[in-house]
Amino acid sequence: MTDLKPFLAKVASREPLTRDEARAAFDILMSGQATPSQIGGFLMALRVRGESVDEIVGAVTTMRSKMLTVEAPADAIDIVGTGGDASGTYNISTLAALIVAGAGVPVAKHGNRALSSKSGAADNLSALGVNIDVGPEIISRCIAEASVGFMFAQLHHSAMRHVGPSRVELGTRTIFNLLGPLSNPAGVRRQLLGVFSPQWLVPLAEVMRDLGSECVWVVHGDGLDEITTTGITKVAALEDGKIRSFELSPADFGVSPCVLADIKGGDGVANAAALREVLGGAKNAYRDVSLANAAASLVISGKVETIRDGMKLAAHSLDSGATALALDKLIAVSNDID
């Protein structure tokens, strides 16, 4: 079917789509076969009614089928957030990814330029000197040689160009804010996945279970799409096919609580400078929150069993210079394209 109208009529009447229907509908959207009015109406009908797990699974299945893939080790991990929390924090997941890479776990980092903040992962890494405009072969080399590679979302999801203008005109969150982090081009099966609202914790854990992920922690920390050190982080953890919910506090990581202003960032250049300060030995709230996210990621990866062991390994990665070395290698390999 190449006509969106039947699916549009169904969601407009507040009926949920089946997985197959969602897969077909998003194939129409992402193949350029729907008009801007149809795209806008469809996305907002889903948003107002509330997207179901089956609809997200179907949409992700289509998005994954159209993406440019990257070869990565089977044990690679991603640390990613949905964005959209409007917090303007430092690039926490970026530094956490480098720390995890320095600890010897391969990271296939998926990200984009800023949407609701001043600096997304792509902005931050570009300012650090990483060449983000590279193809799958170079990214695979980065992961092999630096233990971390960056996949710039817009280069891997070209089908998104068909819905981009409508999303901009709508100016509000849609299901596509969720789909990107669920569509890692390296096909990772282990993730630390931050979400902008706690309402999505369990549903997205269910989505990742149904899509075959091995271990995923879906987290929301005190308004942030990250693990936070400002207060309580809520977690829905998918492990061995089962989902359990729990909370984490700064004390669980052995760090002092901070306030949001302590981890507020700026643009890509300012955040790159802040990241370099932490690599240089600065002991501050940015270091603490990044270590916390890295520690959880090391648990998810299977490298360690406990958060406290994760904190020790993450701190060693940072303090030994292994994190800085991972960044240096990433910069070198990503720019070695002759």
Curated annotation (Swiss-Prot):
Its EC number is 2.4.2.18. 5-phospho-alpha-D-ribose 1-diphosphate binds at residues 81, 84-85, 89, 91-94, 109-117, 121. Anthranilate 1 binds at G81, N112. GO terms for cellular component: cytosol. It comes from the Bacteria. Mg(2+) 2 binds at D225, E226. Mg(2+) 1 binds at S93, E226. Catalyzes the transfer of the phosphoribosyl group of 5-phosphorylribose-1-pyrophosphate (PRPP) to anthranilate to yield N-(5'-phosphoribosyl)-anthranilate (PRA). It comes from Rhizobium etli (strain ATCC 51251 / DSM 11541 / JCM 21823 / NBRC 15573 / CFN 42). Homodimer. One of its GO terms (molecular function) is magnesium ion binding. Binds 2 magnesium ions per monomer. Its cofactor is Mg(2+). It catalyses: N-(5-phospho-beta-D-ribosyl)anthranilate + diphosphate = 5-phospho-alpha-D-ribose 1-diphosphate + anthranilate. One of its GO terms (biological process) is L-tryptophan biosynthetic process. Anthranilate 2 binds at R167. PANTHER family: ANTHRANILATE PHOSPHORIBOSYLTRANSFERASE. Signal peptide: none annotated. Keywords: Amino-acid biosynthesis, Aromatic amino acid biosynthesis, Glycosyltransferase, Magnesium, Metal-binding, Transferase, Tryptophan biosynthesis. InterPro entries: Anthranilate_Pribosyl_Tfrase, Glycosyl_Trfase_fam3, Glycosyl_Trfase_fam3_N_dom, Glycosyl_Trfase_fam3_N_dom_sf, Nuc_phospho_transferase. Belongs to the anthranilate phosphoribosyltransferase family. Pathway: Amino-acid biosynthesis; L-tryptophan biosynthesis; L-tryptophan from chorismate: step 2/5. Gene3D superfamilies: Nucleoside phosphorylase/phosphoribosyltransferase catalytic domain, Transferase, Pyrimidine Nucleoside Phosphorylase, Chain C. This is Anthranilate phosphoribosyltransferase.
